[in-house]
């Protein structure tokens, strides 16, 4: 969207801009975060009754749902919070263009065992799913109907896998090269560090998605400087880069601190992420946050590395609570009949499947057919 750019342009010209989240909350996202964190409010209805107006909208409801998830270990489909989620979080999967969903199990650091590969392959074959390796070193399974998701995830969870959170505004992946274990150029064990970071920050809800990378040397095979948090090995330890991303407006991550030992590296990442989660605007990536926060990267460095605001212990404690309280979201669904009941195409006909879902398998790969959509009638004919 061009809205954030327009806001920054107007602000640079001295135009006073409202920080209100939407018509129902006059506070910014950061202000709402502080209200929730300081008051212990755990429901949207209480928050809007005490600090907002009306009944909410498609802007404020997902934002509040994210804030509630960032400040507790409650399941995102618990009680009234479930109704706040957008389409992807509502079914813990990414909706695709024909109404089916993708399934992405977590493969920490890109590691996967032969046994896990066999389970993934068998699941894909049994459910007729299209498979593809992602840019984040994971395996994506496409074409699952909503009612198939619990069946698919039960088999993956039983095999020791868990949600990869590809559907959420949260940590996605920690990409890594093979590092010093295998590569003759590697100076540190990048795989071990990537796995440790992914297991630490998995499930961490934030204003936008978070991607990380760990490279075992300066050759940068994991493309760490194109990530929100990038780690590059040195002979003395690790360089920490922050605020990178790809997408329509790619940004190179900037150096936050250099030659860190492993403990200091993790501590600084903890504080950086928690400071970002507390102060960023709605749907704001780390790169834009660094550019727009007062004082920029220098201020962030002072907060993270020098505790200039005196909140380092609080940030550390908040991350410790997240790590201790983490639970796999799909395992939580599989153990709860009430949550399982939502995975149907039609709530008034739970045993019926969506008849508009179809696929074209006549070409080199399986693709969705968009029945009832403009141009879909000739989709098969055009490939003949």
Can you name each region flagged by the protein language model?
Residues 1-39, 46, 60-67, 180:
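Ferredoxin-type iron-sulfur electron-transfer modules and their immediate structural context
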Residues 3, 33, 59-62, 68, ...:
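Charge-rich, low-aromatic oligomerization/scaffolding segments with amphipathic character
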Residues 9-11, 23, 27-28, 101-239, ...:
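Small-residue-enriched alpha-helical segments and adjacent helix-cap loops
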Residues 45, 62, 76-80, 129-135, ...:
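Flexible, glycine/charged-enriched surface loops at secondary-structure junctions
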Residues 216, 220, 225-287, 299:
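Mobile "lid/hinge" segments at catalytic clefts and subdomain interfaces of large enzymes
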Residues 284-384:
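C-terminal accessory nucleic-acid interaction domains of nucleic acid-metabolism proteins
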């Amino acid at each position: 969207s061009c809205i954030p750019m327009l806001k920054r342009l107007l602000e640079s010209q001295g135009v006073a801009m409202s920080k209100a989240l939407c018509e129902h909350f006059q506070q910014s996202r950061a202000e709402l975060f502080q209200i929730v964190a300081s008051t212990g409010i755990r429901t949207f209805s209480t928050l809007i009754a005490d600090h907002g107006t009306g009944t909410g909208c498609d802007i404020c409801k997902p934002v509040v749902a994210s804030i509630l998830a960032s400040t507790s270990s409650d399941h995102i489909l618990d009680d009234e919070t479930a109704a706040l989620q957008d389409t992807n979080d509502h079914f813990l999967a990414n909706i695709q263009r024909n109404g089916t969903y993708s399934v992405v199990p977590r493969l920490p650091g890109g590691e996967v065992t032969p046994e896990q590969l066999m389970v993934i392959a068998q699941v894909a074959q049994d459910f007729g799913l299209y498979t593809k390796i992602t840019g984040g070193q994971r395996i994506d399974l496409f074409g699952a109907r909503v009612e198939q998701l619990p069946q698919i995830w039960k088999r993956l969870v039983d095999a020791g896998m868990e949600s990869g959170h590809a559907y959420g505004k949260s940590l996605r992946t920690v990409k890594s090269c093979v590092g010093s274990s295998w590569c003759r150029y590697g100076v540190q064990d990048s795989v071990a560090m990537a796995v440790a970071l992914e297991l630490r920050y998995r499930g961490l809800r934030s204003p936008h998605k978070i991607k990380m990378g760990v490279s075992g040397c300066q050759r940068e095979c994991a493309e760490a400087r194109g990530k929100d948090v990038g780690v590059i090995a040195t002979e003395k330890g690790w360089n920490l880069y922050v605020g990178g991303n790809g997408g329509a407006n790619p940004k190179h991550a900037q150096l936050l601190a250099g030659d860190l030992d492993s403990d200091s590296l993790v501590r600084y990442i903890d504080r950086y992420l928690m400071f970002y989660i507390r102060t960023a605007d709605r749907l704001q990536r780390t790169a834009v946050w660094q550019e727009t926060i007062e004082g920029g990267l220098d201020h962030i460095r002072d907060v993270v590395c020098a505790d200039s605001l005196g909140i380092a212990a609080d940030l550390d404690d908040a991350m410790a609570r997240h790590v201790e309280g983490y639970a796999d979201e799909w395992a939580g669904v599989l153990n709860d009949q009430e949550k399982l009941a939502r995975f149907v195409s039609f709530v008034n006909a739970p045993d019926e499947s969506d008849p508009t879902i179809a696929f074209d398998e006549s070409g080199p790969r399986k693709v969705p057919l968009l029945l009832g959509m403009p141009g879909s009638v000739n989709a098969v004919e055009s490939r003949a």
